[in-house]
Amino acid sequence: MAHYINIYGKRLFDIGLYLKTSVDLILQQQHVLMSQQKFTDISLCHREAPNPKLDLPDDNRLSPLTELEDIGQQSKTLGTAIHRKISEQKRVIESGSVASIVEHKRTNLSAIMATRANIPEQVRGAPLVDGLKIQNKNGAVKNRRALGDIGNLVSVPGVQGGKAQPPINRPITLSFRAQLLANAQLERKPINGDNKVPALGPKSQPLAARNPEAQRAVQKKNLVVKQQTKPVEVIETKRNAQSKAACGIVNKPKILDIDESDKDNHVAAVEYVDDMYSFYKEVEKESQPKMYMHIQTEMNEKMRAILIDWLLEVHIKFELNLETLYLTVNIIDRFLYVKAVPKRELQVNDLVYVTDNAYSSRQILVMKKAILGNLEWYLTIPTQYVFLFCFIKASISDPEVLHVQKKNLQASKTKSFSIQVLSFSSHKSIVKSDQFCKKFNLCQEVTALASEFHLGNCEAWRETVTKLKDPETKCLKVVFEYTASDACGYG
């Protein structure tokens, strides 16, 4: 701002100097002309020429040259004053005295405001007549306070008997804020309820207190109202539960991710589990054994049960893989379905490795060739072990317990209850020909569901297994058939 003022001051000074130089030049030319006596009547012309600006008498009129000279002199004086004032401000700014600058501005502002005319304030409803307010009938002047800033401001009362303290301007810290709150609580006015007016005299008792019958009637009415009143929260809870039940919103058990523990195991191929089990169910229809007892002439279901029971004992004795057991039983049933086998050759079919040289190698090779030829070399099938392993994962949510159960299942040990129930029911299904000829996944689902009934996790297990089985599968009847007896039967 000072820079611009300095520039404008210099320009005004230059203009004044230019005007002064022009006036001097004009006066010099005028004196030269008058000396040559070419304009002898110039003064007369000036006196007779009318002045368009000022209507003064002839003796008070000034010539144009004189006016230009005065204007030039005033402009030069003004430019000199402005230049001097700018120099003073520049010296003050260079000295760094900020207080003097502020005081200088205030002085200039006061001088400017003092030059303004004091216009009387005109209030609505009180017009001015010759600069005076009109008075009302009572002779009082209508004075109205001007409206200020309308806000949520509360005026602080002044200090009585002393000087007004300046306002506190300090940052509000935690301690200062706590102090302000404490002072506000101390200065808070008491509640209206605390200021009780003392009784002037003894109150008269109500009519019910003086009448015993009326008092008993009031007590009986209050008791009935209390008995009819119920908690609002209980009513709202019941209504919410009823509305959820009507809309079909029920708190269903959480579906467990049974493959979560195998996400880091690349051999488990968790990404393809759903596709694999869908493929197993499709292939199961082709490799499922069919009822063949009406084809066989020399054997019955009891003889088959004795054979499979002996095979189970050999399996446990040599600690073979459980999947090998299921595959062996499947091969036996499929072979008996396509060919009638005499009684003397029945035990050769699956016990070739445990006969202890009871049969010759030629007989073993002949029987092996006959089995593979009749089955068309179709031996790779999804056995019960695949579905049993899946349902065990769905039955046990604890990863540590699941790891132990997997090891027990692979080692064919029956120490835990889940493996005992599953092994018992699964072994019973392969012993009974009518049950073994059903779907493998149905049989293993039944065995897993039986153990969950005993452990109390049936509902959660059903929700988890829904995506692993067909929705229309109903196996409760088979569960009771499996768990009805205490040991394996041969019927």
UniProtKB/Swiss-Prot annotation:
Tissue-level expression: Expressed in roots, stems and flowers.
Domain of life of the native organism: Eukaryota
UniProt KW keywords: Cell cycle, Cell division, Cyclin
Cell cycle recorded as keyword: yes
SUPFAM superfamilies from the UniProt entry: Cyclin-like
The keyword Cell cycle belongs to this UniProt entry's keyword annotation: yes
Alphabetical list of Pfam families matching this protein: Cyclin_N (PF00134)
Domain Cyclin N-terminal: 275-347
Entry's Gene Ontology BP terms: cell division
Cysteines engaged in disulfide bonds, as pairs: none
Gene3D superfamilies named among the record's database cross-references: Cyclin-like
UniProt similarity note: Belongs to the cyclin family. Cyclin AB subfamily.
Protein name listed in UniProt: Cyclin-B1-5
Species: Arabidopsis thaliana
